[in-house]
Swiss-Prot record:
Keyword Lipid metabolism: no
Lipid-carrying residues in chain (N-palmitoyl cysteine): 20
InterPro entries: GerD_central
Bilayer disposition of the protein: Lipid-anchor
Source species, domain of life: Bacteria
Primary residence: membrane
Stored Pfam families: GerD (PF17898)
Gene name per UniProt: gerD
S-diacylglycerol cysteine lipid sites: 20
GO cellular component, one term: spore wall
Subcellular location: Cell membrane
Name by which UniProt lists this protein: Spore germination protein GerD
Signal peptide (UniProt feature, chain positions): 1-19
Length: 185
């Protein structure tokens, strides 16, 4: 009988405790409240510290690292596809973009050339070509040849089609048009 009383009393206490407990508030929270709470937590110093620790964790960094082969494949597909070729053709028609791109490449090319000029092997090779006694004769023959003239014409055409030159030429034309408009007024 005492076991039955103890069991009955335990059940009664358990029911009364659970009946008096507050409702589960997590079920009542809507999305906006949860979002605000999470944002507030992340803005605290503890939240920022937790994120920094998470980003410094090696296992997490390994999970975040993207497969380099996948990146390479995506870039190759994007750049070499017909859509990619069309995209690059269209974007390089924009003189402002082409100018910026050319300026970026120009600085890199200048760095490479300056590095080469400091390279002793490159200097020796360049000097041996320049000091060759027959080079003067070859230069004058070359300048008179039809091949050189064709090459020179090609270089001039390339220069005229260069994004940097186009931009400079465009700017000069605009400036000249403004000056002409001012003079005629």
């Amino acid at each position: 009988m005492s076991k039955a009383k103890t069991l009955l009393m335990s059940c009664f206490l358990l029911l009364s405790v659970t009946a008096c407990a507050p409702k589960d508030q997590a079920a009542d929270m809507d999305y906006d409240q949860t979002k605000k709470m999470v944002v507030d937590i992340l803005k605290t110093d503890d939240g920022k510290k937790a994120i920094k620790e998470l980003l410094n964790d090696d296992a997490m960094n390994e999970a975040l690292v993207i497969d380099q082969d996948a990146i390479k494949g995506t870039i190759e597909k994007t750049l070499t596809s017909k859509k990619g070729e069309e995209f690059w053709k269209n974007i390089f028609e924009d003189t402002d973009f082409a100018e910026g791109f050319a300026k970026t490449l120009q600085t890199e090319h200048e760095k490479v050339i300056k590095k080469l000029m400091k390279d002793p092997d490159y200097q020796k090779m360049l000097m041996s070509v320049m000091q060759d006694p027959g080079m003067d004769k070859k230069y004058s023959q070359l300048a008179k040849s039809q091949e050189f003239r064709s090459y020179l014409e090609e270089v001039i055409n390339e220069t005229l089609s260069s994004p940097l030159y186009k931009k400079q030429f465009e700017d000069e034309l605009k400036k000249a048009a403004k000056d002409t408009a001012k003079e005629s007024e």
